[in-house]
Amino acid sequence: MASQVSAVDDILSEYHGLEQQMADPELHNDAAAARRVGKRYSELQPIINVHRDLVSAQEDLEAAREMAHEDHEFQAEAERLEVEVVELEEKLADLLAPRDPHDGEDIVMEIKAGAGGEEAALFAGDLLRMYQKFADKHGFVVEVLDSAESDLGGVKDITLSIRSRQPSRDGAWSQFKFEGGVHRVQRVPVTESQGRIQTSAAGVLVYPEPDEVENVEIDEKDIRVDVYRSSGKGGQGVNTTDSAVRITHLPTGLVVTCQKERSQIQNRARAMQVLAARLQAMKEEEAAAEAATGRAAQIRTMDRSERIRTYNWPENRISDHRIGFKANNLDSVLDGELDDLFTALQAAERAERLEAEG
């Protein structure tokens, strides 16, 4: 409890300091600094609110107990407040628990069709729609940066940006970070005339997006920039200028493309953001792999080739192999109802973090 009090005191001090910064007109002359301060302020706000509610409930409980000595009618109120205080203490402890430092950040997501031809591309399209529906329900903004469709309207490869509408301690990363890995589907493909169940797969990559590209060191000498004419479905030209951008990071071989914007400058800026996210993730994953040597694999795996989940159409079942989660509501999940699964994954990660801290 003493450590919790100390943590709250530190947060209160930081919060008041942020309030003073936000009241300073000079801050708003620096957009990047204002964004950082506003984001941190939003991250601390839930802790401040719960702490205030807890202090108020504790004061009310003390008063109710005193009055209950003289008037037994206040005993019920005291008992209600005792329950409220315990609930708020648990909520505050949860908010103060160790967190992933990227949880408040936006993300870049890539979905790639795996083995299985058209069927794999159609499944990748199903995953795309599932994530889009979940994002819409939870107030995230989805932006397609680059995509390639299959002949039947599936997704061969797509790159997305998923962002919070407002700064929050529970950003897109806190929700989607567990999705990286191989997703497997079992169903009868639309191209199968004999009604046989087949297995196909799609790969999902997820990276936290840095607040500023400048926060990730990228030497201009290490990149090659190619421009080309953006195209739509089937290669049909949709832009008569060379506005699409392909950036190759020579030391790592990473390639990023963006053709969403009509301006080459805008596409280059977005491609650089995606490259920064991928390089940052690569660096952090290398460090995490070193730190995890000899330790059990984490819930959010660093192995992008690992099969993390199976979607079984005939049995309407979804299975997450990392935590043993199973549910027979595949239709709802594909409609964006991922809350139960994500909550289970978050709980497993939280338990893992607490164990590591202990």
Swiss-Prot record:
<dbReference type="InterPro" id="IPR050057">
    <property type="entry name" value="Prokaryotic/Mito_RF"/>
</dbReference>
<keyword id="KW-0648">Protein biosynthesis</keyword>
<dbReference type="Pfam" id="PF03462">
    <property type="entry name" value="PCRF"/>
</dbReference>
<dbReference type="InterPro" id="IPR004373">
    <property type="entry name" value="RF-1"/>
</dbReference>
<dbReference type="InterPro" id="IPR005139">
    <property type="entry name" value="PCRF"/>
</dbReference>
<comment type="similarity">
    <text>Belongs to the prokaryotic/mitochondrial release factor family.</text>
</comment>
<dbReference type="InterPro" id="IPR000352">
    <property type="entry name" value="Pep_chain_release_fac_I"/>
</dbReference>
<feature type="modified residue" description="N5-methylglutamine">
    <location>
        <position position="236"/>
    </location>
</feature>
<keyword id="KW-0963">Cytoplasm</keyword>
<dbReference type="InterPro" id="IPR045853">
    <property type="entry name" value="Pep_chain_release_fac_I_sf"/>
</dbReference>
<protein>
    <recommendedName>
        <fullName>Peptide chain release factor 1</fullName>
    </recommendedName>
</protein>
<dbReference type="GO" id="GO:0016149">
    <property type="term" value="F:translation release factor activity, codon specific"/>
</dbReference>
<keyword id="KW-0488">Methylation</keyword>
<comment type="function">
    <text>Peptide chain release factor 1 directs the termination of translation in response to the peptide chain termination codons UAG and UAA.</text>
</comment>
<dbReference type="Pfam" id="PF00472">
    <property type="entry name" value="RF-1"/>
</dbReference>
<dbReference type="GO" id="GO:0005737">
    <property type="term" value="C:cytoplasm"/>
</dbReference>
